[in-house]
């Protein structure tokens, strides 16, 4: 009997694990482990396998929210680091793939059900064209995806670390706030959970008011309750999200559509359709007609990254 393969999607905050029949997408024994509770990746894997009572898998594909091109992988938003070679030897994996988390998000998109996609505005996907997968969580992920002759071909990027480009005087004032705190300001500094909180604090400072909220969830809750500063921060967050995702769609030529993933946006579905996201996405000067026709969806599938790791396991385009 074929042993199940180990599948993982590891972010800065949580590690999600599952088992799957190699070559299939029948996820089972899905668990979410807080990264901070485990000193290392190996400890988390062992804890997961013990919890679900599974035999040691011989195949594994794990996705991480950080660069993964070297043998030594260092997480960007938590303290884990490991050697791919040593982990494969430690667990006896005969097949061990390590991919970027947004490579996994990209590869998961073709396997998402239609009722797990929420359209933002109009647009029609061009067949056979590149897709953009983009979204904020603990950090900001960005990847491309296009159909190859036999398999889906992912284009991993670290596009979340491109420089933030303000589009009006208010954003130039916000940039000055972020520069005072961080020096160089990447778009990830703004388009992530901590970035939403920082945007709120920046709005408070610019308005010469006291910031009352201390977590992104508190800011979102206050915005829903009508707090003007929190509301302005959230609306600006979504407008900048449109700016950056529209720029990324131009860079990749993503006429196949834009898929917004991550832990934040599915919780903002009541805000996104009424925000300036879509206008900012399309507002690209001479390229307005190009971006205006690109469809955008929010992916609500809870385990999209795990589905992508399943796809990657035996996808010959993913090494």
Swiss-Prot record:
Against InterPro entries, the record matches this protein to: ATPase_NBD, Bacterial_glucokinase, Glucokinase
What sections of the sequence does the record tag as coiled-coil? Answer: none
Q: Where in the cell is it found?
A: Cytoplasm
Keywords assigned by UniProt? ATP-binding, Cytoplasm, Glycolysis, Kinase, Nucleotide-binding, Transferase
Q: Which GO terms describe its biological process?
A: glycolytic process
Fetch the CDD domains from UniProt: ASKHA_NBD_GLK
Recorded catalytic reaction(s): these are: D-glucose + ATP = D-glucose 6-phosphate + ADP + H(+)
Chain sites annotated for binding ATP: 8-13
Enzyme nomenclature, EC number:
2.7.1.2
Question: What main location does UniProt list?
Answer: cytoplasm
One GO cellular component term? cytosol
Tell me the Pfam families matching this sequence. Answer: Glucokinase
Superkingdom of the source species: Bacteria
GO MF terms here are: ATP binding; D-glucose binding; glucokinase activity
What NCBIfam families does the entry give? Answer: glk (TIGR00749)
Family (UniProt): Belongs to the bacterial glucokinase family.
| Protein name per Swiss-Prot or TrEMBL | Glucokinase
Recall the taxonomic lineage recorded for the source organism. Answer: Bacteria, Pseudomonadati, Pseudomonadota, Gammaproteobacteria, Oceanospirillales
Question: Which gene specifies this protein's sequence?
Answer: glk
């Amino acid at each position: 009997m074929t042993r199940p393969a180990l599948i993982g999607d590891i972010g800065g905050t949580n590690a999600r694990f599952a088992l799957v029949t190699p070559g299939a997408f029948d996820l089972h024994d899905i668990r979410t482990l807080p990264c901070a509770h485990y000193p290392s990746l190996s400890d988390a894997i062992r804890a997961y396998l013990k919890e679900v009572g599974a035999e040691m898998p011989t195949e594994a594909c794990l996705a991480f929210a950080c660069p993964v091109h070297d043998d030594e992988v260092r997480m960007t938003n938590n303290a884990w680091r490991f050697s791919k070679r040593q982990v494969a030897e430690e667990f006896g994996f005969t097949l061990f793939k390590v991919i970027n988390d947004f490579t996994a998000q990209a590869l998961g998109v073709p396997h998402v059900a239609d009722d797990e996609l929420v359209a933002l505005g109009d647009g029609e996907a061009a067949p056979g064209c590149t897709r953009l997968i983009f979204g904020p969580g603990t950090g900001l992920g960005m990847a491309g995806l296009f159909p190859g002759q036999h398999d889906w071909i992912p284009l991993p990027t670290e596009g979340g670390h491109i420089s933030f480009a303000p589009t009006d005087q208010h954003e130039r004032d916000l940039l000055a706030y972020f520069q005072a705190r961080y020096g160089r300001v990447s778009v990830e500094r703004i388009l992530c959970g901590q970035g939403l909180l920082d945007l709120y604090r920046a709005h408070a400072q610019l308005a010469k008011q006291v910031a009352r909220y201390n977590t992104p969830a508190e800011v979102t809750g206050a915005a829903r309750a009508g707090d003007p500063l929190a509301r302005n921060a959230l609306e600006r967050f979504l407008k900048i999200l449109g700016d950056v995702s529209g720029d990324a769609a131009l860079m990749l030529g993503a006429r196949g559509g834009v898929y917004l993933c991550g832990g934040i946006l599915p919780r903002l579905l009541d805000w996104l359709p009424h925000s300036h996201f879509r206008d900012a996405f399309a507002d690209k000067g001479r390229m307005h007609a190009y971006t205006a026709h690109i469809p955008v969806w929010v992916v609500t599938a809870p385990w999209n990254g795990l589905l992508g790791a399943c796809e990657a396991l035996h996808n010959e385009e993913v090494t």
